[in-house]
């Protein structure tokens, strides 16, 4: 950059900005790619990130994928790098911080695991906040010229780190867990000679000389999410010391749960193999319990006993035990837990999270990781949104074109990255087996009659127009609907559903059903075949055609012994027997509930104002690109009432469960899925599990804090504001 004069750079920047402006502004991806070479990109970054740089500015660099691997801010006047600035930007390999930097926000460079080499923090740097560089595993050197305060987990899991150099004579404030997840015996700490003793005794820095583990205190009343039905702590009784524990005892039917218990002992406690006698962790099947998911958990100095009617119930007891081991979250290993007794069972039958690999593909291994995390909070269903306008993501052997042509595209709104990928049936069978180890069922979703552009792209005869259409590159609602008068539609759906039923053993298949055009179902009004079908059947309205389509598909699912699910819309005038509807639209939950009660149907609650976890958790939070999304705060999610004010008869006869949705128009990395989900998913889990009398938002904030600390320690993204 030094080889050009300031004037020539300014002229080049002016020409570039003018070109962008004439080509639809900053969101014109082709403009970015045509006019921004590396040098101009650097200058553009400096222009964009001036004194008033904000999250939206950084989003332009993070998510609008100019194919740059270097972020050089050495010429920038930027003083504040905000929270999440380049969150999970895996393409970055090099970072140079601005010379007048004041602060780096929470998770600003979280999981930027490509950044390598040395990072220099100028003397002006006042703060590096929580998890700012957590997971930057290729960083090797850190150099601080000033007295920079270093927040919790700021450099956790930077496992490639080999040298940390500081100029400050007085040790800067540093969280004791700032460098968690690193073997500090391999890291050289270089400080002024006269300050070595001070650093040796200073929190955070002392860990470079010898590990100082704070004792993990377990206070059960201030732990546990979801909150159990009954909890008694016996403070006058002797606690269980993990160093005394011998091992795990369980019948053959609980072999999977025994492995989970052994994992908890190995990862979460100071237990060591080798003792011959002492306390045991005992897992017991107890058929006297009346609820299949009910468990009891007893702890005393003689050991741990978890009883459940089923293996699932015992597993939930183990997830509670694991949270007890996390304790107050200051250490990765538990020394002891107090004597206690827990009696627990869920309020609702299904606690579900939905992920959307269509808009942004989710790699297979990342789906597995998400299952492990959601199971910690006793979620028991992963809802996979496999089909939409933007892609078809599941192999259908009868129609290989669906993934050959329908799983690849370039772009999602203003994010121009190449997005491709699909799941084979063998992968999904493996996922089902993996999820079963965590007592999570996998529910597949296709779409009809709308959100089917990818299918119509592959098979134009599915639509009324019978014309080829491109895969959609934007969010929103398309008028390309499946044609209810087309015989091939039913042949196609029969074959797709038959294959899905064979791959996914869960008793449910989700059929979509939402947002079928603008106006809803309007595309059928101009279709001669649909008009003829109306006349033949004596119909006068398009909603009757939708009923006709769904009746046939639902009958097919019933023949496959599957329960149909779909998103409730007002165009559904009746709900077919044996179906499950989802209340999702803002302001229409009561309407959906009334329809479910009237039709004796089951209902899942996922109203957007509480359960749309892809919405930002607070104003200005990710995703900063906002096409009308409201904020869904942690408190809003927590305050979801699954009964929606209805009586106990509704809870008994109609309420099936709760669901949190993670639509991925703006979620373009696995880390961002976790960030959007947690801790709101934990709040939703408590809404679906715990009875109202045991719920308190204020107390939840206390109870969830150790769990979010634990996630950061493990390098899992979580919204910690």
Q: Where are the language model's segments positioned?
A:
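Acidic, contiguous N-terminal accessory segments
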Residues: 179, 215-349, 560-571, 705-721
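Bacterial Sec-dependent N-terminal signal peptides
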Residues: 1-57, 218
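Flexible, acidic glycine-rich loops studded with aromatic residues
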Residues: 564-569, 574-721
């Amino acid at each position: 950059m030094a080889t050009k004069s300031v004037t020539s750079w300014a002229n080049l920047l002016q020409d570039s900005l003018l070109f962008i402006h004439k080509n639809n502004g900053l969101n014109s991806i082709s403009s970015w790619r045509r006019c921004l070479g590396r040098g101009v990109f650097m200058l553009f970054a400096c222009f964009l990130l001036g004194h008033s740089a904000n999250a939206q500015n950084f989003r332009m660099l993070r998510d609008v994928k100019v194919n740059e691997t270097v972020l050089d801010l050495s010429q920038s006047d930027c003083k504040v790098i905000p929270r999440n600035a380049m969150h999970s930007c895996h393409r970055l390999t090099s970072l140079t911080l601005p010379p007048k930097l004041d602060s780096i926000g929470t998770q600003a460079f979280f999981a930027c695991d490509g950044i390598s080499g040395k990072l220099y923090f100028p003397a002006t740097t006042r703060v590096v906040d929580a998890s700012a560089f957590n997971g930057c595993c290729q960083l090797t050197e850190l150099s601080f010229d000033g007295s920079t305060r270093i927040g919790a987990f700021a450099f956790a899991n930077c496992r490639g780190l080999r040298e940390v150099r500081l100029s400050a004579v007085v040790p800067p404030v540093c969280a004791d867990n700032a460098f968690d997840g690193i073997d500090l015996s391999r890291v050289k700490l270089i400080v002024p000679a006269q300050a070595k003793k001070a650093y040796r005794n200073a929190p955070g820095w002392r860990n470079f000389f010898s590990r100082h583990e704070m004792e993990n205190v377990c206070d059960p009343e201030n732990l546990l999410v979801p909150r159990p039905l009954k909890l008694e702590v016996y403070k006058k009784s002797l606690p269980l010391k993990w160093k005394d524990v011998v091992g795990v005892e369980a019948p053959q039917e609980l072999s999977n749960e025994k492995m989970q218990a052994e994992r908890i002992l190995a990862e979460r406690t100071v237990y060591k193999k080798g003792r011959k006698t002492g306390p045991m962790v005992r897992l017991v099947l107890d058929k006297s319990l009346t609820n299949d998911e009910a468990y009891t958990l007893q702890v005393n100095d003689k050991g741990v006993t978890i009883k459940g009617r089923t293996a699932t119930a015992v597993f939930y007891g183990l997830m509670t035990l694991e949270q007890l081991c996390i304790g107050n979250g200051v250490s990765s290993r538990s020394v002891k837990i107090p004597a206690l007794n827990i009696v627990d069972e869920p309020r609702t039958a299904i606690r579900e999270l939905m992920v959307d690999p269509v808009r942004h593909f989710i790699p297979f291994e990342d789906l597995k990781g998400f299952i492990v995390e959601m199971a910690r909070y006793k979620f028991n269903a992963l809802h996979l949104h496999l089909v939409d306008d933007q892609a078809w993501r599941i192999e259908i052997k009868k129609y290989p074109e669906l993934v050959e042509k329908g799983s690849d595209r370039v772009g999602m709104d203003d994010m121009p990255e190449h997005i491709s990928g699909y799941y084979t049936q063998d992968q999904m069978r493996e996922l089902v087996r993996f999820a079963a180890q965590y007592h999570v069922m996998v529910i597949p979703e296709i779409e009809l009659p709308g959100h089917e552009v990818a299918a119509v792209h592959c098979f134009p005869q599915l639509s009324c127009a019978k014309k080829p259409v491109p895969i959609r590159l934007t969010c929103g609602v398309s008028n390309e609907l499946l044609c209810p008068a087309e015989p091939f539609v039913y042949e196609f759906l029969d074959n797709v559903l038959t294959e899905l039923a064979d791959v996914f053993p869960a008793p449910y298949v989700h059929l979509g059903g939402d947002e079928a055009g603008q106006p809803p179902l309007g595309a059928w009004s101009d279709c001669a075949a649909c008009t003829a079908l109306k006349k033949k059947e004596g119909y006068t309205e398009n909603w009757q055609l939708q009923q006709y389509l769904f009746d046939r598909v639902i009958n097919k699912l019933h023949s496959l012994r599957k329960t149909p699910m779909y998103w409730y819309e007002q165009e559904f005038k009746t709900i077919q027997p044996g179906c499950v509807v989802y209340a999702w639209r803002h302001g229409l939950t009561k309407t959906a509930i009334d329809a479910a009660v009237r039709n004796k149907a089951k209902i899942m609650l996922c109203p957007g104002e509480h359960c749309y976890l892809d919405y930002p958790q607070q104003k200005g939070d990710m995703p900063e690109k906002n096409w009308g999304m409201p904020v869904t705060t942690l408190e809003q999610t927590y305050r979801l009432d699954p009964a929606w004010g209805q009586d106990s008869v509704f809870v008994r006869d109609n309420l099936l469960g709760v669901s949190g949705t993670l639509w991925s128009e703006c979620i373009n990395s696995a880390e961002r899925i976790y960030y959007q989900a947690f801790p709101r998913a934990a709040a939703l889990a408590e809404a679906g599990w715990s009875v109202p009398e045991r719920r308190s938002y204020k107390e939840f904030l206390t109870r969830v804090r150790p769990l979010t600390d634990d996630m950061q320690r493990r390098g899992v993204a979580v919204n910690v504001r």
